[in-house]
Amino acid sequence: MINVLIIDDDAMVAELNRRYVAQIPGFQCCGTASTLEKAKEIIFNSDTPIDLILLDIYMQKENGLDLLPVLHNARCKSDVIVISSAADAVTIKDSLHYGVVDYLIKPFQASRFEEALTGWRQKKMALEKHQYYDQAELDQLIHGSSSNEQDPRRLPKGLTPQTLRTLCQWIDAHQDYEFSTDELANEVNISRVSCRKYLIWLVNCHILFTSIHYGVTGRPVYRYRIQAEHYSLLKQYCQ
């Protein structure tokens, strides 16, 4: 399991991020910290190694950026993803200077959160896989694609135009309906796992918008709806 530490002084936000983490297979939240002092205690003194830190910037009496040089000087192996409302260029530049692996501006979509964590894991695994790289492999690792840039809307391996058409036709016929993965999978008679792959792709293409809801049990449910400004893209896949 990948151990995640959440640093945020807002208890409700920290809990929401903890639930997001719990929804991604292979990740677990092993602690939360509302101060930088508490965070350093967990990072440097805990028996559980911290693989990934989710760091807020604007805290009540502290700036989350102050933790980055501490980690850098200590040669800490924990990677950092910033999750903050800070959108100014200076803060972003400082964060990137200290090597944060991703930066999410609040409020963010659940799909973007998942993309940040799974993308980081993919790169981490790739780095541990080889001792040496050729240029094409390095391009893939750094840029997420080969030097011959591919169409981002090209279906990835394992997804078929026929199934995509079926899903898009159902979504088109229910434009005002916000639906879950389970609901759509049942309607078009495909597996939930397969359906979720198509939905993630549609979200990444900005055709669908995703939000998270909590039922009476507190279990999060992702729901999807059409992004009106990209409705024409959906229609293309209905043909």
Swiss-Prot record:
DNA-binding span(s): 181-200
Pfam family, one: Response_reg
Single GO MF descriptor: DNA-binding transcription factor activity
Modification comment: Phosphorylated and activated by DcuS.
Keywords: Activator, Cytoplasm, DNA-binding, Phosphoprotein, Transcription, Transcription regulation, Two-component regulatory system
Domain Response regulatory: 3-121
Subcellular location: Cytoplasm
Entries under PROSITE patterns matching the protein: RESPONSE_REGULATORY (PS50110)
SUPFAM superfamilies: CheY-like
Residues bearing PTM 4-aspartylphosphate: D56
GO cellular component terms, semicolon-separated: cytoplasm
Function: Member of the two-component regulatory system DcuR/DcuS. Involved in the C4-dicarboxylate-stimulated regulation of the genes encoding the anaerobic fumarate respiratory system (frdABCD; nuoAN; dcuB; dcuC; sdhCDAB; etc.). Weakly regulates the aerobic C4-dicarboxylate transporter dctA.
Name this polypeptide is given: Transcriptional regulatory protein DcuR
Organism: Escherichia coli O6:H1 (strain CFT073 / ATCC 700928 / UPEC)
Lineage: Bacteria, Pseudomonadati, Pseudomonadota, Gammaproteobacteria, Enterobacterales
Protein's gene: dcuR
